[in-house]
Amino acid sequence: MICLVLTIFANLFPAACTGAHERTFLAVKPDGVQRRLVGEIVRRFERKGFKLVALKLVQASEELLREHYAELRERPFYGRLVKYMASGPVVAMVWQGLDVVRTSRALIGATNPADAPPGTIRGDFCIEVGKNLIHGSDSVESARREIALWFRADELLCWEDSAGHWLYE
């Protein structure tokens, strides 16, 4: 119940979801699931110190994916992207932590794996841009929209992270 209240509060007052309470949406794409990289990806975010607040394995509908990627509708690869994302299971996740949107983008690496440095998820595990393993929100605003698309408020778990005092001042 308290988490539901906090989620409603965060939607009414977006500035409340900054700092250590900032959230981002990540999705391991079908190639990442098929290649059995979900655990490795989760491990990297946990080791960084972020808190997992939601996770589910889903077969995304084309309708959901068209809404998720609406801003790319005019791009030539849009149709292929939607079909690809609907071609297999996706692991949808919400992570929470200080500056999690920006930091998760750095952990993921450049959209084009050729531009992603070693040590990033795409730099270590991807070869081509069409199969780049993972989606990560590109802004706090996008994260809010994407989280609301993929998760109901009651699916976002509020829990006390015992390691928090070792991570934040």
Swiss-Prot record:
Domains (record comment): The N-terminal hydrophobic region (1-17) is critical for mitochondrial outer membrane targeting and phosphatidic acid binding.
Superkingdom of origin organism: Eukaryota
Protein name in the entry: Nucleoside diphosphate kinase 3
SUPFAM superfamilies (alphabetical): Nucleoside diphosphate kinase, NDK
EC id: 2.7.4.6
GO molecular function, one term: ATP binding
Record organism: Homo sapiens (Human)
Positions of ADP binding: K29, R105, T111, R122, V129, N132
Effect of F13A: Lacks phosphatidic acid binding activity. Decreases NME3 enrichement at the mitochondrial contact interface
HAMAP family (alphabetical): NDP_kinase (MF_00451)
Record's subcellular location: Mitochondrion outer membrane; Cytoplasm; Cytoplasm, Cytoskeleton, Cilium basal body
Keywords from the UniProt entry: ATP-binding, Cell projection, Cytoplasm, Cytoskeleton, Kinase, Magnesium, Membrane, Metal-binding, Mitochondrion, Mitochondrion outer membrane, Nucleotide metabolism, Nucleotide-binding, Transferase
Family: Belongs to the NDK family.
GO biological process: apoptotic process; CTP biosynthetic process; DNA repair; GTP biosynthetic process; mitochondrial fusion; nucleoside triphosphate biosynthetic process; UTP biosynthetic process
Quaternary organization: Homohexamer. Interacts (via its N-terminal region) with KAT5; this interaction enables recruitment of NME3 at DNA damage sites where it plays a role in the repair of DNA. Found in association with several ciliary nephronophthisis proteins, including NEK8, CEP164, ANKS6.
